[in-house]
């Protein structure tokens, strides 16, 4: 477990609620131990406290089982281009077509390709996943290989702008990530950080608890973005909120190098995550009440990073038959529902054609529905998306 707050260094912590009892759903190399949503009582940072390390997450993101997604395939061309234009507008007046730009944890390279197409020819990305680098290379995107937490001494230049677009919240060692970025940034350069907006979690039109995905280790509000800058010597030049690609609310902060300053306590993030927990439970209630009443046999499909919280009592009074996930590294994991142990199984292990399949995830909903159809299941299918 974490021994101190990574922002302010405070050693005490407030445990808010358990996310999951078994971190091994992230992979065999993760510890068989719980993860707890936690608040720093000194600065108000909200983080997931667990026994995992940055190396565990590095292995997770470089695993052969990882599925790099492209913005265009998820959101479509129109929504993606509008979203990328929204991002570009946040710092367009700070750069030129000759500026050196690095997209931190750039994934499959979609944003860098967008920048190149719009005239920013000196754009490249930092990425740890060889699979992502291969995909980006086919798009003509240049990559710097690295995990984002180490100082890269081989770089021949520094950057005018570094972007972290939905990457910072995925790192345990955000202190090392920020210091590495500052080292790669010119003294008069800018750092753009964009993360999910915790204050708007309850507005998210998706499966309840989706924003508590285990891949998101830290949760942020505009106030905690101020503290992030204060702790690591970054001055906030601009910050704000907007809606990402017709999907969910995000916030951003544009920083430049400065001196470290004192953090201030804010309850905004704690209030937001607790409100989202209550909102999610209330949204689920009619759905779960019906299952409890009918006692129809249920096959729960999609036991992963964004759905494990649903295993914490949600289905305890329902007639659960099986837990299913197609990810091999999750098969064999054990969960207890109403004091009965269940093992996550392969879709091929489904034998009861009358049981109702309940699709749990938001992120992989469409691919699961497609797989159910392709495998020829005749079961009734319901989704937590409604």
Question: Language-model features: where?
Answer:
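Conserved N-terminal segment of class I S-adenosyl-L-methionine
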Residues: 1-165, 175-178, 250-254, 258-294, ...
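Short loop/edge segments at beta-strand edges and connector loops
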Residues: 145-147, 238-240, 344-346
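Hydrophobic, well-ordered beta-alpha structural blocks that scaffold small-molecule cofactor pockets
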Residues: 250-386
């Amino acid at each position: 477990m974490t021994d101190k707050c990574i922002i302010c260094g405070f050693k005490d912590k407030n445990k808010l609620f358990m996310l999951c009892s078994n971190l091994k759903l992230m992979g065999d190399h993760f510890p068989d131990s719980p993860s707890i949503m936690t608040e720093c009582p000194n600065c108000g940072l909200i983080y997931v406290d667990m026994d995992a390390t940055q190396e565990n997450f590095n292995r997770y993101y470089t695993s052969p089982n990882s599925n790099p997604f492209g913005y265009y395939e998820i959101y479509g061309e129109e929504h993606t281009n509008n979203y990328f234009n929204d991002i570009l507008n946040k710092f367009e007046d700070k750069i030129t077509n000759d500026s050196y730009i690095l997209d931190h944890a750039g994934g499959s390279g979609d944003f860098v390709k967008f920048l190149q197409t719009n005239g920013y020819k000196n754009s490249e990305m930092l990425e740890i996943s060889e699979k992502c680098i291969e995909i980006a290379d086919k798009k003509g995107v240049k990559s710097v290989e690295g995990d984002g937490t180490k100082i890269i001494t081989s770089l021949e230049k520094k950057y005018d702008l570094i972007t972290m677009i939905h990457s910072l919240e995925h790192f345990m060692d955000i202190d090392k990530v920020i210091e590495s970025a500052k080292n790669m940034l010119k003294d008069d350069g800018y750092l753009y950080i964009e993360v999910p907006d915790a204050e708007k979690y309850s507005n998210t039109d998706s499966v309840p608890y989706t924003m508590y995905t285990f891949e998101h280790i830290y949760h942020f509000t505009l106030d905690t973005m101020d503290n992030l800058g204060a702790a690591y010597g970054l001055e906030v030049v601009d910050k704000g909120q907007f809606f990402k690609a017709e999907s969910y609310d995000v916030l951003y902060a544009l920083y430049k190098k400065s001196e470290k300053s004192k953090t201030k306590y804010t309850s905004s993030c704690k209030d937001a995550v607790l409100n989202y927990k209550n909102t999610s439970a209330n949204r689920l209630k009619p759905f779960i009440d019906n299952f409890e009443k009918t006692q129809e046999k249920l096959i729960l499909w999609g036991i992963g990073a964004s759905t494990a919280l649903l295993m914490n009592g949600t289905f305890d009074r329902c007639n659960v038959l099986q837990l299913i996930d197609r990810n091999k590294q999750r098969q064999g994991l054990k969960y207890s529902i109403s004091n009965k142990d269940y093992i996550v199984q392969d879709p091929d292990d489904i034998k009861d054609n009358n049981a109702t399949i309940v699709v749990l995830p938001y992120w992989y909903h469409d691919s699961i529905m497609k797989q159910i159809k392709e495998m020829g299941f005749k079961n009734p299918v319901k989704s937590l998306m409604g």
